[in-house]
Amino acid sequence: MFKENIDCIDAGTEYCPCKLAESGECLLCSQLHGSTFCDCLNWKGICIYQEFYYNGNKAKEGRKTYNCIVEDRTLYDNEVLLIKFKAPHKLVIDLSKPGSFIFIRTEENIYFDVPISILDANIDTNIISIMIEIRGVKTKKLLEIKEGGNITIRGPYWNGVFGVKNIKKQKDSNAIVLARGIGMAPMLPVIKKLKENNNQVTVILDKAPFKDIYVTDYLEALEIVPQEMNLIDKGELSAEAK
């Protein structure tokens, strides 16, 4: 008998069970998916059904919204916005994982929630850094954010990086990280995790469509000297990258 490999990034966390359990659509718990027997997929060390029962047969509270103070704001070449803001310590810890992201908006705007990957989450200073490519109406609205002002965020959310399990398992080995454009932002937590696991990390960057590499300071802090390369040619991996 074969089972589909199904997982849930929230399983076993403080956000589990979620609204899917209330509607009988839990991804992992068989009893919260219409069955009358236990046949859990990807056991996470906690019984989701028991948590649901002890919580009054309802979902746990979802992600919270926070108003945070903007510590620094830098606009690079009118195309990339770097924002650093102060956040609660536990939230910073939660967002230090590879693939973490949040939803952000200006304090006055209740409609335009923008999902943004975490560039850096400093658990010593409680400063979170995010980098945003300015393109459409939602991201242009974020240009109104000023240093010393407030930013409204909702999170934490995880697994914005595919294959995050493999990143965590990679130890005492060699790794190559390729990134292009705004992909350089979520790249940083991945590099951090790889280096924490004693991997030798080679970083190859393609700054296109930007004019420059805007994460140089963060790479220097990790003692990484990136190689520059054209990674994409007419929608395909370039001959140079191959």
Predicted feature residues:
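FNR/FR-type flavoprotein reductase catalytic core
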Residues: 137-242
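Generic preference for well-ordered secondary structure
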Residues: 13, 54-57, 69, 102, ...
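Amphipathic repeat-derived elements
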Residues: 1-4, 113-119, 165
